[in-house]
């Protein structure tokens, strides 16, 4: 109830702001006469500081002033408090974060939707990343880089196939020997469910009609699949004989050549009846532009700079700019950290596109809560799915 009241107050504040009259106050200027913009950084390791420094050295019109802008018990702020401050124009013009603190519905009230900005760079971005982002229900945080959750296996273990159905995966796993499983045995039911949500949750929500289908047979099958993993409170298995190994592909690991040294590997998507994406998108750093910013044009200019070659060169993750990804790949091949075949495997992972869960935190918590009750034996998968459907349907209806 407290959260609902906060959101109602937030909407009222924004409506009041929309109806305000008069001229906007003059923007603060730096000592050199440039328009001053503020950027709050929520993580000490954020690359945003480097972006701001480089931008300031290039821009003749704007200057970014970076400040720590944290929330938590020590700071006396909650995420809701920060959202309210941003709506009132008391927060920074830009907000850089490395977490997923703002994957909620209220983001559309306080942050600028960045779909048009991405469209400007459509021909320059990694196609799979661009398409995954455009498939989301609004783009409010500009990713500075990305990673990919996927599964890896040995081509020799799957007959050289590029995709598997669940039945095929079970057959290949059985061929490994007694006690072998399809997925990592160390994954608990809850941990495995997180991967299920990451790869498929978005496909059970229709954002055009604000409806969902978590009571479908397909989702029920996924819940039952999770029950095949070890219980959350069970000890770690002594051995982990499995067909598919859950893998977060990061730029440092990939360009460092660690995975490639083994040689016999391939990327595999979540088993499905239809071939499709082999991985799902993860975004580390994101930069948001506040709706209440007094100089949205200047803030957008900075975001365009973040997508420039010189800024993308600073990104530790996989860069979202295709030319920078190509440059790093060429360098890795030339220095023999990977082969041309390795480069082709990365292309094969990205080219079919990437999944994007696009599930607001509130829905994620609903699904996780009901799933954990099922995994603990408090209800059947069908009962859990029915409760998920009811609660998420209500949530979506209230916001349609």
List each model region and its residues.
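Extracytoplasmic "Venus flytrap"/periplasmic binding protein-like
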Residues: 61-125, 242, 259-260
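Long, aromatic- and glycine/proline-rich binding clefts that accommodate carbohydrate-like moieties
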Residues: 316-369, 373
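Extracytoplasmic/periplasmic substrate-binding proteins
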Residues: 224-298
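Short, polar/charged alpha-helical segment
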Residues: 43-63, 67, 103, 367
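Short, well-ordered beta-strand elements
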Residues: 31-44, 62-69, 94, 140
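Hinge/lid segment of periplasmic solute-binding proteins
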Residues: 97-150, 264-270
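Helix-loop-helix "hinge/cap" segment bordering the ligand-binding cleft or interdomain interface
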Residues: 115, 133-235, 297, 380-383, ...
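A bilobed periplasmic-binding-protein/Venus flytrap-type ligand-binding module shared by bacterial periplasmic
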Residues: 151-156, 282-297, 314-317, 324-325
């Amino acid at each position: 109830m407290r959260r609902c009241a906060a959101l109602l107050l937030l909407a009222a504040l924004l409506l009041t702001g929309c109806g305000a009259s008069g001229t906007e106050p003059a923007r603060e200027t730096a000592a050199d006469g440039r328009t001053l913009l503020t950027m709050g950084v929520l993580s000490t390791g954020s690359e945003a500081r480097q972006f701001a420094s480089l931008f300031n050295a290039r821009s003749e019109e704007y200057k970014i002033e970076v400040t720590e802008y944290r929330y938590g018990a020590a700071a006396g702020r909650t995420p809701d408090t920060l959202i309210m401050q941003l709506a009132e124009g008391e927060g920074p013009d830009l907000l850089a974060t490395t977490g997923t603190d703002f994957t909620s519905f209220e983001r559309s009230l306080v942050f600028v939707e960045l779909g048009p900005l991405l469209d400007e760079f459509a021909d320059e971005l990694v196609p799979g990343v661009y398409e995954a982002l455009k498939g989301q229900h609004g783009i409010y945080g500009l990713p500075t880089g990305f990673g990919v959750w996927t599964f890896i296996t040995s081509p020799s273990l799957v007959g050289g196939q590029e995709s598997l159905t669940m039945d095929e995966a079970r057959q290949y796993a059985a061929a490994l020997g007694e006690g072998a499983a399809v997925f990592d045995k160390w994954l608990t039911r809850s941990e495995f469910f997180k991967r299920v949500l990451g790869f498929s949750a978005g496909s059970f929500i229709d954002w055009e009609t604000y409806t969902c289908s978590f009571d479908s047979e397909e989702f029920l099958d996924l819940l039952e699949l999770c029950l095949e993993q070890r219980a959350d409170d069970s000890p770690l298995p002594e051995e982990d004989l499995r067909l598919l190994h859950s893998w977060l592909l990061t730029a440092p690991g990939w360009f460092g050549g660690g995975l490639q040294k083994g040689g016999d590997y391939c990327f595999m998507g979540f088993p499905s009846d239809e071939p499709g994406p082999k991985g799902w998108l993860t975004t580390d750093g994101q930069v948001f532009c506040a709706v209440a910013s007094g100089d949205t044009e200047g803030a957008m200019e900075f975001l365009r700079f973040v997508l420039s070659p010189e800024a993308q060169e600073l990104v530790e993750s996989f860069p979202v700019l295709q030319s920078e990804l190509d440059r790093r790949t060429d360098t890795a091949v030339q220095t023999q950290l990977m082969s041309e075949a390795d480069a082709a495997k990365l292309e094969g992972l990205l080219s079919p596109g990437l999944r994007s869960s696009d599930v607001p935190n509130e829905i994620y918590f609903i699904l996780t809560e009901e799933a954990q009750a099922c995994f603990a034996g408090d209800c059947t998968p069908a009962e859990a799915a029915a409760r998920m459907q009811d609660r998420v349907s209500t949530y979506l209806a209230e916001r349609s």
